């Protein structure tokens, strides 16, 4: 069997629990080890914080009150108790507020905080020391005049400061600080009352700072803000130290249930900061009250909701939307929360005059109605384009029909006029050829009439001489006339077939073209 090595047990105490006595004992050594940077020290001297200034002012006020009280009353002071459990007992040393030390912070943060507070604490102790010396001198002069002097005066005279100071200006903590029983360090009941009032004021300020986030952003109605403003304007006596944001006198006091009607739920506004509301009280109060009274009806209709009356069948949804939008914009313009862009976008009919909005109470329940302008319907661009396109289409149809009928007429004319197979005539050439054909027909008719007359004369004579006369007539006549006469004699009627006539016209046409070219 192999022997297992026993591992040593290590106990680690990771809990860091510094106690108050340890830190109090090391505070003097920490101040010696840490050197305050000169730049940081000068910055603290030149730019004190607002809290330090307020604390110094409170200390000066308390010291002045204490000096006045000591001059007026010369009484026997009660001895100082050996221990000071309360923070009010430290007021005799000029320290009205104790520093809250976080004892659960690490060591490096303890060093940094002690170094930062060293400069301020030294300044406070110097001021307190100077004031305390003046108090001791006044007390010594008063006590020398009295016959009986307590034993504590001798100790105070021997040590005018009443306590020892170290090299850094810090008061050294020792048992003598608590055992000294001088008349100057004793507390009167009036002084304790003043200190208690200051502590209560500080507690109220802390509570107000915690509740300010919730109070400032509570949604309230316009009526509630107006009621709070009237209450704020009432004469009240408050001390100068009380904060204006006191929770006991809040600007957002809610009204009773009887005053919160249904029509008020439509007019929610988020309240601004109390400072801005206080500045606008005198300007907005009368306008808001007058505008709200204009929307309320008489005594018999207190519970009547004018906004819900629009839900009836008398008004349409668009009317309700327009009226609600006009009322909301009017409320925002009176309350000072309207935007310039919204006012510019609104039409003058929606805004109206101030008198028309504020004098709406005379209407006794008649809601604000936007007048509708019924204009003539203008044709849209699409309708105009459609009409134009229809007209264009009809014109094109008529043009095609006209062209088609003209082409049909020329085709019929070309069929009547004798043409050659090689002819590719245009419309103008077709018309010219038609005129020439008409001229040819006129000549044929005139020559045929003469030949017919001669033929009739020859028929009355015997056949042989008639035949001889006919042969001489044919020889005398040219080609077309001779053929025409022969045809007429053969048929016995003056009718020429179209084929023969076209052939004759073709021959005549070619002869005319040849003569024209020669010329």
Swiss-Prot record:
Residues 53-77, 131-156, 301-321, 368-389 are annotated as: Disordered. One of its GO terms (molecular function) is protein homodimerization activity. The lineage of its organism: Eukaryota, Metazoa, Ecdysozoa, Arthropoda, Hexapoda. It is found in: Nucleus. Efficient DNA binding requires dimerization with another bHLH protein. Homodimer. InterPro entries: bHLH_dom (IPR011598), E-box_TF_Regulators (IPR050283), HLH_DNA-bd_sf (IPR036638), Twist-rel_bHLH (IPR015789). The gene is twi. Keywords: Developmental protein, Differentiation, DNA-binding, Nucleus, Transcription, Transcription regulation. Coiled coil: none annotated. Residues 390-441 form the bHLH domain. GO terms for cellular component: nucleus. Residues 54-76, 134-146 have a biased composition (Low complexity). This is Protein twist. Residues 308-317 have a biased composition (Polar residues). GO terms for biological process: gastrulation; Malpighian tubule morphogenesis; mesoderm development; mesodermal cell fate commitment; regulation of striated muscle tissue development; ventral furrow formation. It comes from the Eukaryota. Involved in the establishment and dorsoventral patterning of germ layers in the embryo. Residues 368-379 have a biased composition (Basic residues).
């Amino acid at each position: 069997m192999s022997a297992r090595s026993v591992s040593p047990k290590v106990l680690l105490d990771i809990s860091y629990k510094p106690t108050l006595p340890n830190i109090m004992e090391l505070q003097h050594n920490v101040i010696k080890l840490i050197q305050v940077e000169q730049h940081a020290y000068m910055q603290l001297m030149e730019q004190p914080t607002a809290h330090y200034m307020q604390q110094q002012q409170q200390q000066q006020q308390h010291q002045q009150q204490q000096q006045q009280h000591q001059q007026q009353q010369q009484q026997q002071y009660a001895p100082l108790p050996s221990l000071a459990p309360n923070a009010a007992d430290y007021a005799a040393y000029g320290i009205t507020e104790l520093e809250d030390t976080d004892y659960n912070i690490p060591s490096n943060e303890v060093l940094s905080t002690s170094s930062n507070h060293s400069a301020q604490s030294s300044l406070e102790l110097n001021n307190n020391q100077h004031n305390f010396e003046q108090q001791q001198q006044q007390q010594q002069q008063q006590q020398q005049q009295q016959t009986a002097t307590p034993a504590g005066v001798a100790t105070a005279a021997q040590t005018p400061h009443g306590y020892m100071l170290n090299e850094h200006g810090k008061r050294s903590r020792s048992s003598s600080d608590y055992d000294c029983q001088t008349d100057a360090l004793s507390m009167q009941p009036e002084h304790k009352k003043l200190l208690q009032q200051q502590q209560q004021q500080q507690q109220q300020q802390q509570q107000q700072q915690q509740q300010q986030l919730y109070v400032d952003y509570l949604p309230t109605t316009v009526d509630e803000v107006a009621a709070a403003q009237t209450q704020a304007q009432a004469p009240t006596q408050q001390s100068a130290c009380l904060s204006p944001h006191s929770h006991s006198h809040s600007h957002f006091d809610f009204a009773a249930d009887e005053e919160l009607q249904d029509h008020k739920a439509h007019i929610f506004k988020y309240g601004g900061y109390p400072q801005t509301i206080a500045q606008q009280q005198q300007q907005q109060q009368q306008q808001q009250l007058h505008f709200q009274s204009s929307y309320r009806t008489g005594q018999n209709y207190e519970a009547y909701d004018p906004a819900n009356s629009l839900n009836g069948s008398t008004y349409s949804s668009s009317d309700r939307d327009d009226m609600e939008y006009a009322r909301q914009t009017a409320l925002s313009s009176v309350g000072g929360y309207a935007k310039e862009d919204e006012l510019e976008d609104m039409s003058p009919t929606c805004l109206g005059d101030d008198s028309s909005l504020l004098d709406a109470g005379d209407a006794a329940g008649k809601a604000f109605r936007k007048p509708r302008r019924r204009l003539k319907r203008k044709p849209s661009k699409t309708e105009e384009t459609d009409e134009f396109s229809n007209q264009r289409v009809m014109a094109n149809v008529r043009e095609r029909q006209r062209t088609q009928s003209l082409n049909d007429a020329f085709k019929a004319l070309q069929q009547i006029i004798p043409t050659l197979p090689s002819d590719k005539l245009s419309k103008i050439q077709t018309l010219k050829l038609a005129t020439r054909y008409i001229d040819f027909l006129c000549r044929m008719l005139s020559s045929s009439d003469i030949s017919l007359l001669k033929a009739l004369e020859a028929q009355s004579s015997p056949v042989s001489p008639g035949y001889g006369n006919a042969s001489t007539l044919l020889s005398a006549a040219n080609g077309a006339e001779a053929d025409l006469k022969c045809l007429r004699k053969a048929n016995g009627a003056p009718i020429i077939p179209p084929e023969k006539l076209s052939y004759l016209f073709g021959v005549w046409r070619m002869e005319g073209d040849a003569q024209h070219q020669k010329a």
